[in-house]
Regions:
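Phosphate/adenylate-binding "loop-and-lid" substructures adjacent to NTP/NAD/dNTP-binding pockets
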Residues: 1-95
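Catalytic nucleotidyltransferase
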Residues: 6-25, 32, 37-38, 84-87, ...
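Structural beta-strand/beta-sheet cores of well-ordered domains, especially the beta-sheet scaffolds
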Residues: 27, 49, 58-62, 98-104, ...
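Structured loops at beta-to-helix junctions and adjacent beta-edge loops in soluble globular domains
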Residues: 34, 56, 67, 76, ...
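Short, conserved acidic/polar surface loops in the N-terminal third of protein domains
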Residues: 42, 113-117, 166
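Short acidic, glycine/serine/threonine-rich loops at helix termini
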Residues: 65-67, 114-118, 141-143
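Flexible glycine-rich surface loops and low-complexity tracts that mediate binding to linear polymers
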Residues: 94-117
Length: 169
């Protein structure tokens, strides 16, 4: 392992995807995270503005697309291959506008998770793992259909249409 070229170079795209994974229509690399003021100052000195700064949402990164005949929803996976989760679309409040591609986060409000699901559903202890477990299920039962209605998709990047600057999104 220590001498493994792929592991050293961290090339996620060289990994053969699992059967349940699909090639994403757009690459979804991990976003930079800044936790300390010093890191923010370093970032600002390295990159010219303008900037769009947002809070880090703790859920499952997703991509929603309506550029084909049917809408599609994917998880980020390794950024190149993710999971198709189209079966969740009908339970989420997603736009039906044609020809849009939006990146966002599937989350549950923390207060809602604590009041309705903490320790009650599959012994869930935190909201991120709770969301991940639901989203990654191949089939969902009637109880889970109701739970999924409590999940929000929070958009943070409009990929299509392409002419929108981040500050206009």
């Amino acid at each position: 392992y220590p001498n493994n070229k792929v592991a050293k170079d961290q090339h996620a795209n060289t990994v053969i995807p699992e059967k349940s994974k699909v090639k994403l229509p757009y690459t979804m690399m991990s976003m930079d995270k800044v936790k300390e003021l010093k890191e923010l100052e370093k970032f600002k000195s390295k990159y010219a503005g303008p900037y769009v700064i947002s809070a880090k949402l703790d859920g499952v990164s997703g991509l929603y697309s309506t550029t084909q005949e049917q809408p599609h929803l994917y998880t980020r996976g390794n950024g190149f291959y993710g999971q198709n989760i189209d079966h969740l679309i009908s339970f989420l409040n997603l736009p039906s506008n044609k020809d849009i591609v939006v990146r966002g986060e599937l989350i549950i409000k923390e207060e809602l998770f604590k009041s309705k699901y903490f320790g009650k559903y599959r012994n869930s202890k935190n909201s991120r793992n709770f969301i991940s477990g639901l989203v990654n299920r191949k089939k969902i039962n009637k109880d889970e259909e109701e739970i999924i209605k409590d999940i929000d998709f929070v958009a943070y990047e409009v990929i299509v249409p392409e002419n929108l600057k981040p500050s206009e999104q």
